[in-house]
């Protein structure tokens, strides 16, 4: 029979979850409509096609 895992205290849960951090997205230098912009790599094609607004 399966045995449930032990309950983890809130302090232990928060300290365990706080070990990872999100990385900053690498920005690409792209010239769009005569303007030099820095955008994430995944948006380069959309920006060149004019599908997204660059303010």
From Swiss-Prot:
Entry keyword Ribosomal protein: yes
Organism domain of life: Bacteria
GO molecular function: structural constituent of ribosome
InterPro entries, alphabetized: Ribosomal_bL32, Ribosomal_zn-bd
Residue numbers spanned by region Disordered: 1-20
Disulfide bonds: none
SUPFAM superfamilies assigned to the protein according to its UniProt record, in alphabetical order: Zn-binding ribosomal proteins (SSF57829)
GO CC annotation terms, alphabetical: large ribosomal subunit
HAMAP family named in the record: Ribosomal_bL32 (MF_00340)
Family: Belongs to the bacterial ribosomal protein bL32 family.
Protein name per the record: Large ribosomal subunit protein bL32
Organism in which the protein naturally occurs: Corynebacterium jeikeium (strain K411)
Gene that this sequence comes from: rpmF
